[in-house]
From Swiss-Prot:
Family recorded in the similarity comment: Belongs to the MshB deacetylase family.
Protein name per its UniProtKB record: 1D-myo-inositol 2-acetamido-2-deoxy-alpha-D-glucopyranoside deacetylase
Cofactor binding description: Binds 1 zinc ion per subunit.
Top EC class of this enzyme: hydrolase
Organism: Streptomyces avermitilis (strain ATCC 31267 / DSM 46492 / JCM 5070 / NBRC 14893 / NCIMB 12804 / NRRL 8165 / MA-4680)
Binding sites annotated in the UniProt record for Zn(2+): 15, 18, 150
Cofactors named for this entry: Zn(2+)
Gene: mshB
Superkingdom of this protein's organism: Bacteria
Amino acid sequence: MKDLPDRRLLLVHAHPDDESINNGATMARYAAEGAQVTLVTCTLGEEGEVIPPALAHLTPDRDDALGPYRVGELAAAMKELGVTDHRFLGGPGRYRDSGMMGGEQNHRAGAFWAADLDEAAGHLVAVVREVRPQVLVTYDPDGGYGHPDHIQAHRVAVRAAELAADPAFRPELGTPWEIAKVYWNRVPRPVAEEGFARLRLALPGTRFAKSAAVDDVPGVVDESVITTEIDGTPFAAAKAAAMRAHATQVEVDGPWFALSNELAQPLFTTEYYELVRGERGSPRETDLFEGVAP
């Protein structure tokens, strides 16, 4: 087995752009500190909408060119964050973006939402046993906001964490490995409320006409739920640049951004988490690896 860095972080996301919006500052920080940062993206995001008019030819109802284009956007975003280890679950295009909940895309051939759970988890087990992460970051059971691919990414990540530690599960995938800490992406409600209060004052000077609402932000929870706070302020520019790299999906204007709905949101540079498995390193962690042995 090759030598591994002392700290190893695995993030599991549904589509290209989710990682930069949710964890961009965290990823940039740990990459800069020399930790192994591995991102697994479950689909190519083929069903996303397209913001720039100049790229309208990529819309999903045309030649199915959006997914491959977003692969390039993701590569550019990873360069901005300093992350060199990125994989697609099962390989690029193995699982397809399922579209929004209730749509016909949920059940089309290859849709991630319709994937066999243990088969999909097996692809992730291979990654876990290879890179041996101490920390896993993914979504909560609702996927943050109910998107089928986000929910499925949560299910696959949690199942893979279980199976990777089981010696009886597919020994050909490598030596069993137990992940020490599992986190869900979160945003504390007071932080979101303060961010939107600032946004409402600043909105007339932005390129956006309207603001989203606090509850439009995935993963908003009461402050008491938060266990971990990662100050990504030194990496704010890297996070913003990574989000800009996802130009089909995200529009950034200073400390604000919008998705294809054109509703402005705050761009958070401090990122928050809920520890759901493993020992908390301190009452309010400031490092995902607190209490973790190399």
